[in-house]
Amino acid sequence: MIAVVQRVDEASVSVETPAYEARIGRGLCVLLAVERGDGEAQAEWIAGKIARLRIFPDEQDKMNRSVRDIAGAVLLVSQFTLAGNCAKGNRPSFAGAAEPRIGEALYESVAQRLRTKHELCVETGVFGAKMKLSVVNNGPVTLIVQQRHKG
């Protein structure tokens, strides 16, 4: 599982058909790819990592607070292209991405864990849809968080 985590002042995602929009203020915009072989263990780990990452400043301007500490929100957007491999040729291979049925289930699992276990306000994109994403980065602070399955 791969997540690109961005500290944001605001972020939104929209889909034209069917009409859909989700928006957050201060918090994290997370682009998430589920890889072949991923399971609930990776969903649990990455949700915990997203919730606990201390990338927001404290009173001394040190990165010492999590999204939960600042009462921020998470915009979680599926992005299978993060699992793309560009090692050969010029067209990426997405063979490393989970099949859509599994990818969607684990994407939803991460969202649900963030909401229930970590008590965060979570907005989501639409799995598998072509989306437009608007992000106002803060910092910028962008991290790649990855949990590989064992085996």
Where are these regions (language model features)?
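Active-site-adjacent loop/tail segments of enzyme domains
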Residues: 100
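N-terminal, polar/charged subdomain of small-to-medium soluble alpha/beta proteins
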Residues: 1-93, 105-151
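An anionic oxygen-ligand recognition environment, strongly enriched in 2H phosphoesterase
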Residues: 96
